[in-house]
Amino acid sequence: MQRAVPEGFGRRKLGSDMGNAERAPGSRSFGPVPTLLLLAAALLAVSDALGRPSEEDEELVVPELERAPGHGTTRLRLHAFDQQLDLELRPDSSFLAPGFTLQNVGRKSGSETPLPETDLAHCFYSGTVNGDPSSAAALSLCEGVRGAFYLLGEAYFIQPLPAASERLATAAPGEKPPAPLQFHLLRRNRQGDVGGTCGVVDDEPRPTGKAETEDEDEGTEGEDEGAQWSPQDPALQGVGQPTGTGSIRKKRFVSSHRYVETMLVADQSMAEFHGSGLKHYLLTLFSVAARLYKHPSIRNSVSLVVVKILVIHDEQKGPEVTSNAALTLRNFCNWQKQHNPPSDRDAEHYDTAILFTRQDLCGSQTCDTLGMADVGTVCDPSRSCSVIEDDGLQAAFTTAHELGHVFNMPHDDAKQCASLNGVNQDSHMMASMLSNLDHSQPWSPCSAYMITSFLDNGHGECLMDKPQNPIQLPGDLPGTSYDANRQCQFTFGEDSKHCPDAASTCSTLWCTGTSGGVLVCQTKHFPWADGTSCGEGKWCINGKCVNKTDRKHFDTPFHGSWGMWGPWGDCSRTCGGGVQYTMRECDNPVPKNGGKYCEGKRVRYRSCNLEDCPDNNGKTFREEQCEAHNEFSKASFGSGPAVEWIPKYAGVSPKDRCKLICQAKGIGYFFVLQPKVVDGTPCSPDSTSVCVQGQCVKAGCDRIIDSKKKFDKCGVCGGNGSTCKKISGSVTSAKPGYHDIITIPTGATNIEVKQRNQRGSRNNGSFLAIKAADGTYILNGDYTLSTLEQDIMYKGVVLRYSGSSAALERIRSFSPLKEPLTIQVLTVGNALRPKIKYTYFVKKKKESFNAIPTFSAWVIEEWGECSKSCELGWQRRLVECRDINGQPASECAKEVKPASTRPCADHPCPQWQLGEWSSCSKTCGKGYKKRSLKCLSHDGGVLSHESCDPLKKPKHFIDFCTMAECS
């Protein structure tokens, strides 16, 4: 994220009438933050990244705390700005895990020791002001009253005077704090606009895992193309509406609750600047980011939780932090791994890590960088990390923005967002320059779409486990913990104070500073923190001053519920089996005030337009998609004609089967031309499964998703294998050159031709070749071999070839051939005898043996294997009487029933043959002699020993022999 600061930081001279002071040219106002983001706007009050101008009033007040009996609520009363402000507060620390740990690294003792855990959970409250439902408050009641509240368009920030906080901390609820150290500073301001930039260039699609920097000269973001949907996809209809989203790979289109377990790390600069209040400050920042991720515009159920906090007191014990943002990120990513237990079941295991630093971060050319993150890496333990420059409470927005990048969100003005966001590109959380935040929809349609598709493609499976001991986040508004003076100090340094400006109450925080020795007011164009008092019974919420009394209307969570299923969308294909969708939205009601987002299936899909497509010269649907890119490939590779694209199947990972991977015909280069094939495209040539939104889902041979129907060996969908017969054979001799083995006819299915090379040899000097019906070679012709695995498209059928150098050279095809082809063997040199076997299935004609025509007939199946390989065995086949519908019948004439058994293998079995004894191994004394043992076929051919009966194998083919005694 990058700063965008108007000329002079929006400075103005400090005069007696601050309300009439003129604003610097180029200053902008920031619109109100959504009611649900009551914590977020307060944190934005002191930003130097996405700044806002403001004018404010201030008064000293004495808070009156009272515990409401029996209701678990606390009432806070303030008298200021000629009004009474009554805040009704409830404990709210939902973003903290109960058993979180805080460790201090590198204390002077040199050891890493946990601090004694003080219970911060009881500090944080949220609520309403003066009963106004549009008001909001977020306060901390520890060590005084700190935070912000929002009432009637004005934001209020309250903070104890330095000496008062300790005395106030000793006051019990309902008891007035001791005098005289009881004063708090209460400021109010009006709502304004925010301006800010995040200068990442988003012009091109981004590969997942590329580092993303928030400096426009430095960064490139990345995303997984496989995780994207196409804007033309029917499933995108309604994106930008309140649609329930979120899923994992195993459950397509299912909205599931995600828990982002987080480790917060503060470096030495943070420890020195914030002191003992650091932990509370970090949790306050994170509570705002967590509330942003609860807004329904993100279209997912996401909970940010803290499981661990590390505070580094000795820079030698932590990652190297420099002004180089990219280097700091890399150092931190490498360093944080040592603190992450590998098991996701460990209570301290985290999914992402965030480093906070006061170091001024710089990009390649400027030092306007506020944050940096790796993109699309939320479940990568080595790269799920972010670096945030702490420039005040508005660093909460930087945190939410950088986590958005970790969730694979691009900037809203990126090219891939244009069709989703339209002209509204700068009013959402992922805007490269934030201005006029859309309070009703802080997340853009593109951000919701990108995180949904990212999770839907299985990239968030580590987020499914519920944290065991999350740290409770503060429930009070940040403005109640940090008044305007403190917010100015966070942003502009310890000497800065708040500049009252009634015209910008709640909307923009103005702070003192010097320019050329002149005292001026300056701003970073962010509103006051939520919870800052803006009048009697009022406080700042979302840049507006609102009544505190209506807290229940914006603070009570309302859980979302699914609406009705919508109509089915258009089919993705006009024939051949497409996919269509119906969706439902989480709008009955839409969740609000941090209520739960809908969980469960949000999208249904089904098959459509199942009829066969007209023949397109035998081309498959995937071929057509590859060819569609030919016209975009005018530039050739080197020289020659333009590229012709054909599908690539061989060597493609199963997870990439639904990407459109095409190779240049005749060249071999291959590219991912589209992140997804059209829905309904078969996942592979030998599979009936189809692609749906870039994922392979099961479908039957009838092209219906989730159907159990399969092709039988005959290529018949749902058949029982009785309509075809097996043809098999072998070749064990061949002369040099090309010679035909078998011509496989049209309609043949499940073809397999294989040749196993001799052990230790890459080949035997003989190779398989294929010749098309027109006599042209489609494999290994003209004495040119294809050594690598490849897929050959032949009239719409894919022939899979292992490559000539494989130990088992093999050709396979599963679909029925549309034209015959001839298998040949190419023999070269002094080749060993080939060992080629082939099998395929062809349709057989049904035989009828009825003398008199009847409505039933004897139907036979193929003969089974012979029971013996020699010396007379038996074959069996199934003979059934069936009617004209193929159902079992009993009317067939038994006198003409075909035989169901027959003799086979009536030739003699191979026999063992012993040779003559050899000479004795010794010429004198005792030696040994041996004789050869062969296995011979019935025609005298020598066979391997495995062909003869091992039980009859002679045992005496070596023996002792005794010659004359040696002299």
Swiss-Prot record:
Where is the Disintegrin domain positioned along the sequence? Answer: 476-559
Which Gene3D superfamilies would you find in this protein's record? Answer: 2.60.120.830, 3.40.1620.60, Collagenase (Catalytic Domain), Thrombospondin type-1 (TSP1) repeat
- Any domain commentary? The spacer domain and the TSP type-1 domains are important for a tight interaction with the extracellular matrix.
What is the designated name of this protein? A disintegrin and metalloproteinase with thrombospondin motifs 1
Active site per the UniProt annotation:
402
Q: Which stretches does UniProt call biased (Basic and acidic residues)? A: 203-212
* GO terms classed as biological process: extracellular matrix organization; heart trabecula formation; integrin-mediated signaling pathway; kidney development; negative regulation of angiogenesis; negative regulation of cell population proliferation; ovulation from ovarian follicle; positive regulation of G1/S transition of mitotic cell cycle
Q: Which cofactor does it need?
A: Zn(2+)
Top-level enzyme category = hydrolase
Domain of life of the source: Eukaryota
Give the binding site residues for Ca(2+) 2.
261, 344, 465
Per the annotation, the residue ranges of the short sequence motif Cysteine switch are 196-203
Look up the signal peptide feature and give its range.
1-49
Q: List the disulfide bonds.
A: 333-385, 362-367, 379-462, 417-446, 488-511, 499-521, 506-540, 534-545, 571-608, 575-613, 586-598
GO CC, one annotated term: cytoplasmic vesicle
**What is the protein's species of origin?**
Homo sapiens
**The Peptidase M12B domain, residue ranges:** 258-467
Q: How is the cofactor bound?
A: Binds 1 zinc ion per subunit.
Q: Provide the binding site for Zn(2+).
A: 198, 401, 405, 411
Q: Which keywords does this chain's UniProt record carry?
A: Calcium, Cleavage on pair of basic residues, Disulfide bond, Extracellular matrix, Glycoprotein, Heparin-binding, Hydrolase, Metal-binding, Metalloprotease, Protease, Repeat, Secreted, Signal, Zinc, Zymogen
